[in-house]
């Protein structure tokens, strides 16, 4: 017997989307000029940590449900797992744009306090050489690229770790996708620029 699909009430909201709205309020505190600067940085960090765990737990569960032969629907809005994942990704894209704007604001407000984050292309030639030497000595020896191909299984990705995705050129002129682990236990998140006190990259 086919199950009857219930029509969602207009006042009902999907739990996952409701949670993203909550996390947006955390992000709003990071952008609130009435909140002390140090606390705003904390709110920005909490927002991202919350989002990482949300994707790890809740989105991971929805992805598992999508693999099931039975269509699973959320009991308040009648959304399928696939519909929920799409809605979550769409909402997250909007939040990412908002987060980028707030991040730039925070970085701008940190500069008068003597703390600066700088992009590599804004370094002088000498500073660039110093960081290239640092990369060659302190980072490159620990890098190990996992090539994505049909011949190899997709690499296992650890939770709450940072990975870089790169396109590698082959001798034949083609490109291959590689995933590079960037462990927090091996690499420093911030590298200070010796020639500019209080400046990091």
Please give the residue ranges for each predicted region:
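N-terminal non-catalytic structural scaffold regions of very large proteins
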Residues: 2-201
């Amino acid at each position: 017997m086919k199950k009857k699909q219930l029509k969602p009430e207009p006042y009902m909201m999907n739990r996952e989307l409701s949670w993203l709205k909550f996390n947006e309020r955390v992000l709003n505190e990071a952008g609130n000029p009435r909140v002390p600067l140090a606390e705003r940085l904390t709110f920005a960090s909490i927002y991202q940590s919350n989002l990482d765990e949300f994707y790890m737990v809740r989105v991971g569960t929805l992805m598992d449900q999508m693999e099931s032969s039975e269509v699973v629907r959320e009991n308040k809005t009648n959304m399928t797992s696939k519909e929920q994942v799409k809605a979550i990704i769409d909402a997250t894209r909007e939040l990412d744009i908002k987060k980028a704007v707030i991040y730039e604001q925070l970085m701008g407000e940190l500069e008068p306090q003597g703390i600066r984050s700088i992009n590599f292309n804004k370094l002088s030639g000498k500073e660039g050489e110093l960081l290239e030497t640092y990369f060659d000595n302190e980072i490159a020896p620990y890098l190990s690229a996992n090539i994505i191909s049909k011949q190899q299984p997709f690499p296992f990705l650890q939770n709450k770790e940072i990975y870089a995705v790169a396109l590698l050129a082959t001798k034949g002129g083609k490109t291959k996708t590689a995933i590079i682990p960037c462990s927090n236990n091996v690499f420093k998140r911030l590298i200070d620029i010796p020639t500019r006190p209080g400046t990091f990259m």
